[in-house]
């Protein structure tokens, strides 16, 4: 079958860098999905993007759809043929419905029953006759943010300026918002000009001639190579932030790296401020020496060539100098502050219109933190540190520096607190109470920081739940899922055996059930990330108490034992107790009502297991705890072999069920064994 290459390029006004890659991938997925849907075979797919274009190249696209041959099944033979062997109306109707004649029908047996069948054949259409449908594919792309322009109804990420659509050397004809498809694309805005693409395979090279590097991976490698060359030539170290590298890559069509300098006196400003100014505000790469100390230089990437590059460097230096001068001023002004005066200013900042001011939040956090510290048996000095850290945790939010650099909240707070004489533990906690700042991020390194972080996150979650702001689907505007995951991460990192139920006693809430379910889902998410089996997760989360540290370690022990010899039988015995216990109620067990020795032996085994489990759990020895439960298997099996739990005598029945309920409670303190899938 003959084949042709396919090229589709959407030319746009400059797109936001953060949306570029996912938009390119979406276009590629939609195009290959369309080809598959249309039964059009193809070869290699290559994706391109720049701030002004999204493009897909598909090699060896078939010039014709595959023919479709399939067998259609009709009515059963006994319905399709009458007594004389003639086709019935049912058979005739089936053949017409399939576009066939009755002469094409045949009988075939399926699972012992004979049915009427017909072979269907649909000849494939020429690909070029279908390709104009790509206009709908282009307009179907979804973006996080859209706009309208002119009098057009189409909402799109940016106005469409040109479209290149080629199948082989032929243009695929269609139009979108009065833009006709063609073969003309645009080169670099300043260094290139219009160019007519000869064929899809020539696309990348022809654009390169117009100072456009269409392949984002090639652009990225160019930037990395230029950074490495500069570092080697100047004996520098350039710590490359992958997110920044990707963003810069998606801001340019033809990258040329250059470096500039700033006055060394600016190095007296905290490094975090300098780095944030360069990376977040200017998209510059900071420069360090081989010892990791910041140098008064930066690297930026120009969208163009090296023409007049010294002037470009001077211009960037001027912009950075102005920003650093502002930062220096803010830093000096903030050193005049009084922490307690700043805390009072929090009264004038609204946390949320239904939840009061930031000062109100700080008071709630302080109360929770003190209760939590007492629960964790903190000494008197540590309690004072926790209280003070919670009270001043938000003081830096009213500083000049955080007004300008909100991403440095906590970080600058720690520096200012230390500078103004706060205890080291208190200063560190001002920063650490925001940790972890992202999923999988660093957790607080100090006890005080961990306690205040837990309190702050717990208050945020409980407060928003109290006013009905509960995450649903993809909607989580206040990042409550991240906050809950942060609480779980801290509990696991600090080995604190505090259950969700106990945590909720530290806050005032009427949404306890909703909060427990929410925290359980976040714990399930964390356990999934640890590659724990789904049935094991369900088993431990159905235990009597939801406590992250024990849940993780119980799950890990269960996973290790699942394939062990005899574990299947043990799990079945323990699960049998849980199942039958559902028919009873919790009550006192009366040994004088035992009718055989096996009831007594199981009662003794239960008491031993209960005592052992208390000791195992207090030592956090979950392997020993599972062994304590495994020791119940034989007395459980013997009990069921010789005892009818659902006895005719109501007193005996109630006593035996009470024994099952008590035993099930101990088993479920580890896990619900019935949730396990053991083979």
Swiss-Prot record:
GO biological process, one term: glycyl-tRNA aminoacylation
Catalysed reaction equations from the record: tRNA(Gly) + glycine + ATP = glycyl-tRNA(Gly) + AMP + diphosphate
Chief localisation class: cytoplasm
One Pfam family matching this protein: DALR_1
Broad class of enzyme this protein falls into: ligase
Quaternary structure (record): Tetramer of two alpha and two beta subunits.
Organism: Bacillus subtilis (strain 168)
Keywords: Aminoacyl-tRNA synthetase, ATP-binding, Cytoplasm, Ligase, Nucleotide-binding, Protein biosynthesis
EC number per UniProt: 6.1.1.14
Localization (cell): Cytoplasm
Any one cellular-component term (Gene Ontology): cytosol
One MF annotation (Gene Ontology) recorded for this entry: arginine-tRNA ligase activity
InterPro entries noted in UniProt: DALR_anticod-bd, Gly-tRNA-synth_bsu, Gly-tRNA-synth_heterodimer
Signal peptide: none
UniProt similarity note: Belongs to the class-II aminoacyl-tRNA synthetase family.
Name of the protein this chain belongs to: Glycine--tRNA ligase beta subunit
């Amino acid at each position: 079958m003959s084949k042709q290459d396919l090229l589709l390029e959407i030319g746009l006004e400059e797109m936001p860098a953060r949306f570029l890659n996912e938009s390119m991938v979406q276009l590629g997925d939609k195009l290959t999905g369309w080809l598959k849907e249309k039964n059009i075979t193809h070869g290699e797919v290559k994706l391109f993007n720049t701030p002004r274009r999204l493009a897909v190249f598909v090699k060896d696209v078939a010039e014709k759809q595959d023919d479709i041959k399939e067998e259609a099944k009709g009515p059963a033979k006994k319905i399709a043929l009458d007594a004389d062997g003639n086709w019935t109306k049912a058979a005739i109707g089936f053949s017409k419905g399939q576009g066939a004649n009755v002469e094409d029908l045949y009988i075939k047996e399926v699972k012992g029953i004979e049915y009427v069948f017909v072979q269907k054949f649909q000849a494939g259409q020429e690909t070029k006759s279908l390709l104009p449908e790509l206009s709908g594919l282009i307009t179907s792309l979804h973006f996080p943010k859209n706009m309208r322009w002119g009098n057009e109804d189409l909402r799109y990420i940016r106005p469409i300026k040109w479209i290149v659509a080629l199948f082989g050397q032929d243009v695929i004809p269609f139009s979108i918002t009065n833009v006709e498809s063609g073969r003309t694309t645009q080169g670099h805005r300043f260094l290139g000009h219009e160019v007519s693409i000869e064929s899809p395979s020539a696309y990348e090279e022809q654009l390169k001639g117009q100072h456009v590097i269409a392949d984002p991976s090639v652009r990225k490698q160019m930037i990395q190579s230029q950074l490495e060359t500069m570092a080697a030539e100047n004996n520098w170290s350039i710590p490359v932030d992958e997110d920044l590298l990707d963003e810069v890559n998606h801001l340019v069509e033809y990258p040329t790296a250059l470096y500039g300098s700033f006055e060394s006196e600016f190095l007296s400003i905290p490094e975090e401020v300098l780095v944030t100014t360069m990376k977040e505000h200017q998209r510059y790469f900071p420069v360090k020496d081989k010892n990791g100390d910041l140098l008064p230089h930066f690297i930026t990437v120009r969208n163009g060539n090296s023409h007049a590059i010294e002037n470009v460097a001077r211009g960037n230096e001027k912009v950075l100098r102005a920003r650093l001068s502002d930062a220096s001023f803010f830093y000096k002004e903030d050193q005049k502050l009084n922490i307690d005066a700043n805390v009072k200013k929090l009264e004038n900042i609204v946390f949320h219109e239904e939840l009061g001011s930031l000062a109100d939040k700080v008071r709630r956090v302080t109360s929770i933190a003190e209760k939590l510290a007492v629960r964790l048996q903190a000494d008197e000095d540590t309690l004072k540190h926790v209280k003070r850290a919670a009270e001043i945790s938000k003081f830096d939010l009213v500083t000049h520096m955080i007004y300008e650099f909100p991403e440095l909240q906590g970080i600058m707070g720690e520096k200012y607190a230390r500078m103004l004489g706060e205890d080291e533990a208190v200063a560190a906690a001002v920063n650490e109470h925001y940790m972890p700042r992202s999923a999988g991020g660093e957790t607080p390194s100090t006890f005080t920081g961990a306690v205040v972080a837990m309190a702050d996150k717990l208050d945020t979650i409980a407060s928003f739940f109290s006013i009905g702001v509960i995450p649903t689907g993809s909607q989580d505007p206040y990042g409550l899922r991240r906050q809950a995951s942060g609480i779980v991460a801290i509990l696991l990192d600090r080995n604190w055996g505090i259950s969700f139920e106990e945590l909720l006693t530290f806050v005032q809430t009427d949404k306890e059930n909703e909060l427990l379910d929410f925290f359980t889902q976040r714990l399930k998410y964390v356990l999934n990330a640890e590659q724990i089996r789904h049935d094991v997760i369900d088993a431990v989360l159905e235990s009597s108490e939801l406590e992250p540290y024990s849940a993780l370690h119980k799950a890990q022990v269960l996973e290790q034992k699942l394939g062990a010899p005899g574990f299947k039988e043990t799990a079945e015995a323990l699960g049998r107790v849980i199942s039958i216990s559902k028919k009873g109620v919790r009550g006192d067990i009366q040994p004088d009502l035992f009718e055989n020795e096996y009831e007594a032996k199981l009662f003794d085994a239960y008491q031993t297991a209960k005592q052992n489990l208390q000791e195992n759990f207090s030592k956090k020895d979950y392997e020993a705890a599972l062994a304590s439960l495994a020791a119940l298997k034989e007395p459980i099996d013997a009990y069921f072999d010789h005892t009818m739990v659902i006895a005719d005598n109501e007193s005996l029945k109630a006593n035996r069920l009470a024994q099952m309920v008590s035993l099930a409670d101990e088993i479920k303190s580890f896990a619900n064994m019935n949730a396990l899938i053991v083979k």
